[in-house]
Each structure stands twice: as C-alpha cells, then as structure tokens.
C-alpha cells in the first residue's frame, strides 16, 4: 500500500486516443505536493505519511502548524492529509516532492472529495420523490414529500426519514477511476470521467483498494529530483563567469588607458626643451639687435 497524493481539480476536457476516440477526462493538478511528516510503528503505532499541498499565506496558518512546516523544512501548505502505507518500506523522506509519475496510464485509482453544495433542497430534488398529484384535491402540496410518520404509535418520526434539507457538500469517494494520462512536467493527472467536487477543490487520490496494484508502478513513490533542473543550477556559475570576464576586460581597458595617459604626459616633457630653445634664441636675437 503506497501513499496517496493531494491534487486540485482544474476542470474537465477531452483527450483523443490513437484510434480516434475522444475520452472525457478530469484534469487534476499537483501543486507542490510534499511529505510533511512520518508516522512510525515505534512512536505512533502505525506507518503513515502526512502530505501537504498548495501554498498558503502566513496569516492563514496557525503558529503550531507553521512550526511543524519549519521543522520539516517545507513551505506553508493549504491542505494536509494523512495516508497509511505498507510498512517501513512505504515511507518517503520528509520534504520529498511527489511527482505526477506516481501513477501510470491505465491504473485505477480512488478519488475522495466534497460534492458540490446545492443548498436547501426539497424532497423531489434531494431524494427523487415524485410529488403529489396536480389536481383532484391537491392545492399547495404538489412538491411536498407526503406523509411524515405514523399516528400515536410510535408517536415519533423515525431517524433517517427522507425529508427536505441541506443537499450536497458531502465527502464522497469515487472508486476505480482510470488514469488516462499523466504530465509530469506540468504536474497534471488526467482521470477518465468526473470526480466529486467543484473547480479548485482539493482531491485525495489513492491506489484502488479493491484492485491489485498494476506492474510498473513506482514503489514507494515517484519523487521529483531536486537536481533535475541542471541548467538552472548552472546558471549562477555561468553568470559569475561572465561577471569575471567583464571585470577582467574592464581592468585591461583601464590599464591601457593609464599607459596611454602616461605616454601622453611624458611626450610633451621631452619636447619642451626643444620648443623653448628657439624661443630663447629669438629673445637673445632681439636683445642683440
């Protein structure tokens, strides 16, 4: 049993297969999904991982949670959930970022979310009741649920009676949904069909509990490598090299300018006696005349 992930519902679209068929899919995005903490048998009595996703503002996170995130050396998370794992082998290191390659195409998953809220709904919309007749004595009770209970015996309304009330916004799990495709570069998971919840709502994605784990699935999970963006890591070194080259060129230019200035100041000093000599001769000639 592997850990699950926390994803955000982006919306629905369709993907075309090689044979020309188009499949309706739900797009789920992994937003900085990281392992926040571990649960071990020695300390907690079971093995599990706490996973966090999203980026939260500091004002929206309580101080104990901020300290826990700082201890784990991860950013502030908007959503945190716990997933049971199979033994110590199923644990991932704290701070590890889970990739979309955690699931493979063709795999079946279970997705948990909160259904869309409908507000206060009547019995016909909430439970599918047929309502009362349009005529024959029915005046203002066309969409009512009809009888509520019995008479003096039992003298009460049974629990669970289907009546009007709040509809939707319930936690539901949809099982055995097929993963059509994954996009690890953008952190997207495409799941066939619909999933419970509205856009921008959080979903918990797990391996299907009623089906065996397919071959080729990474265990204990697919982690984003920190050294993957090699070009970005080499960029500061390249920038420093460029700065050093520019500094060296500026130093060479300054040295050339200083040498030129020295030569310019030294040349007139040598020519001054030659220039002054004729002037002295002219003055002497004037005196003699």
Curated annotation (Swiss-Prot):
Residues 230-245, 253-262, 276-289 have a biased composition (Basic and acidic residues). Residues 230-289 are annotated as: Disordered. The keyword RNA-binding applies. One of its GO terms (cellular component) is cytosolic large ribosomal subunit. It comes from the Bacteria. Pfam families: Ribosomal_L3. The keyword RNA-binding applies. Methylated by PrmB. The modification N5-methylglutamine is found at residue 152. PANTHER family: 50S RIBOSOMAL PROTEIN L3, LARGE RIBOSOMAL SUBUNIT PROTEIN UL3C. Part of the 50S ribosomal subunit. Forms a cluster with proteins L14 and L19. This is Large ribosomal subunit protein uL3. It comes from Erythrobacter litoralis (strain HTCC2594). The lineage of its organism: Bacteria, Pseudomonadati, Pseudomonadota, Alphaproteobacteria, Sphingomonadales. The gene is rplC.
């Amino acid at each position: 049993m592997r850990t699950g992930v926390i994803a955000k519902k982006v919306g629905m679209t369709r993907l075309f297969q090689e044979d020309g068929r188009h499949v309706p899919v739900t797009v789920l995005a992994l937003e900085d999904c990281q392992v926040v903490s571990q649960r071990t048998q020695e300390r907690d009595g079971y093995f599990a991982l706490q996973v966090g996703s999203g980026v939260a503002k500091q004002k929206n996170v309580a101080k104990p949670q901020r300290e826990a995130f700082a201890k784990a050396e991860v950013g502030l998370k908007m959503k945190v959930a716990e997933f049971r794992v199979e033994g110590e082998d199923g644990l991932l290191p704290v701070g590890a970022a889970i990739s979309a390659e955690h699931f493979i195409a063709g795999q079946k998953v279970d997705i948990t979310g909160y259904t869309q809220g409908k507000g206060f709904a009547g019995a016909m919309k909430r439970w599918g009741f047929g309502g009362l007749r349009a005529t024959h004595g029915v005046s203002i009770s066309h969409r009512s649920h009809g009888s509520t209970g019995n008479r003096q015996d039992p003298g009460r309304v049974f629990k669970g009676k289907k009546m009007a009330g709040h509809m939707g916004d319930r936690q539901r799990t949809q099982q055995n949904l097929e993963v059509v495709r994954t996009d690890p570069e953008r952190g997207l998971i495409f799941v066939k069909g619909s999933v419970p919840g509205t856009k921008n709502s959080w979903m918990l994605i797990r391996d299907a509990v009623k089906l065996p784990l397919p071959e080729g699935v990474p265990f204990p999970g697919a982690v984003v490598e920190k050294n993957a963006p090699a070009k970005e890591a080499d960029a500061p070194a390249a920038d420093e090299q460029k700065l050093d080259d520019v500094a060296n060129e500026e130093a060479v230019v300054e040295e050339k300018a200083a040498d030129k200035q020295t030569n310019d100041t030294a040349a007139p000093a040598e020519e001054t006696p030659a220039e002054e000599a004729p002037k002295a001769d002219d003055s002497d000639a004037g005196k003699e005349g």
